[in-house]
Amino acid sequence: MAVIYYDKDCDLSLIEKKLIGIVGYGAQGHAHAQNLRDSGLKVIVACVEGGRGWKKATADGFEVMCVAEMAKKADIIMMLAPDTSQAKIYKDSIEQGLKPGKMLMFAHGFNIHYGQIVPPSFVDVTMIAPKCPGYMLRQVFTEGAGAPSLIAVEQDASGKAKELALAYAKGIGSNRAGILETTFAEETETDLFGEQAVLCGGTTSLVKAGFETLVEAGYQPEVAYFECLHELKLIVDLMYQGGIAYMRDSISDTAKYGDFTRGPRVINEDTYETMGEILGEIQDGSFAKEWILENQAGRPVYNSLRRMESEHLIEEVGAELRSMMSWLKKKR
């Protein structure tokens, strides 16, 4: 079972005199910076000068500067820029500012695990990865609670890397919920697999397959949309709240029997085999290589697929039906 750390394991005083630099002020960056500041820690923010993040961080009362200047000043540097831009940011603006005693932190392990960023041996390299969106990390903190995080240590030059990372986790409030120990490899590989096989790739493909099956059988696209996409939220919310068993206890016996007997015919042995292949491509680095080369080439495949998917009938039907739902209009 996983090792989980709580408040008793976290000593905020270890970083009270250190200057923390946050790279990026987007979804996660703003939450980290504000939670750390509210915990009494010294925080500076690095963004693209004049950009939206720069303006927002300035408006929120932070000292904002370019990444290179921040890298020279900060004792702890947390990389919260998009994964695809981190390697260039590191090479151009951070690497030269690193000195013994500093710690480089990440919220996702991709660039370290796949060698896109190779820090010098004299710095600590750690990860604190909150398991929630940035807005939720901030919200629960202000309510006096916290969000769970993952912690990993890739490099322990100081001999105190884990303790310092735990202190950082306390600064963003994760000590109030729990900090689960992992590795850069495990976090990266499971995160990518979850995205590709279940949360994004698996779910969207399943939804579209169900929608297309009904439409091709002569059912109205609008009804197919409701049954295969719209109602998905009802089921996911139940699983999110209490797990699979809780969801099953909340649906009809007819739905439950169909779940037990037909579900395994949809997700069958062939699916398991394909999932294993997808995991293998993540583990051996071939997916990472493919994605890195795709970015270097200007994303031709990505852009083509994105355009093609946006033209799927389910998007047209969904837009029409969502326009009928006043509660969705209010959220936009």
UniProtKB/Swiss-Prot annotation:
GO terms for biological process: isoleucine biosynthetic process; L-valine biosynthetic process. Residues 1-182 form the KARI N-terminal Rossmann domain. Its cofactor is Mg(2+). NADP(+) binds at Y25, G26, A27, Q28, D83, T84, S85, Q86, G134. The active site is at H108. It catalyses: (2R)-2,3-dihydroxy-3-methylbutanoate + NADP(+) = (2S)-2-acetolactate + NADPH + H(+); (2R,3R)-2,3-dihydroxy-3-methylpentanoate + NADP(+) = (S)-2-ethyl-2-hydroxy-3-oxobutanoate + NADPH + H(+). InterPro entries: 6-PGluconate_DH-like_C_sf (IPR008927), KARI (IPR013023), KARI_C (IPR000506), KARI_N (IPR013116), KARI_prok (IPR014359), NAD(P)-bd_dom_sf (IPR036291). It holds the Pfam family KARI_N. Residues 183-328 form the KARI C-terminal knotted domain. Pathway: Amino-acid biosynthesis; L-isoleucine biosynthesis; L-isoleucine from 2-oxobutanoate: step 2/4; Amino-acid biosynthesis; L-valine biosynthesis; L-valine from pyruvate: step 2/4. The keyword Magnesium applies. Keywords: Amino-acid biosynthesis, Branched-chain amino acid biosynthesis, Magnesium, Metal-binding, NADP, Oxidoreductase. GO terms for cellular component: cytosol. Binds 2 magnesium ions per subunit. Mg(2+) 1 binds at D191, E195. Its EC number is 1.1.1.86. Substrate binds at S252. Mg(2+) 2 binds at D191, E227, E231. GO terms for molecular function: ketol-acid reductoisomerase activity; magnesium ion binding; NADP binding. Involved in the biosynthesis of branched-chain amino acids (BCAA). Catalyzes an alkyl-migration followed by a ketol-acid reduction of (S)-2-acetolactate (S2AL) to yield (R)-2,3-dihydroxy-isovalerate. In the isomerase reaction, S2AL is rearranged via a Mg-dependent methyl migration to produce 3-hydroxy-3-methyl-2-ketobutyrate (HMKB). In the reductase reaction, this 2-ketoacid undergoes a metal-dependent reduction by NADPH to yield (R)-2,3-dihydroxy-isovalerate. This is Ketol-acid reductoisomerase (NADP(+)). It comes from Dehalococcoides mccartyi (strain CBDB1). The lineage of its organism: Bacteria, Bacillati, Chloroflexota, Dehalococcoidia, Dehalococcoidales. The gene is ilvC.
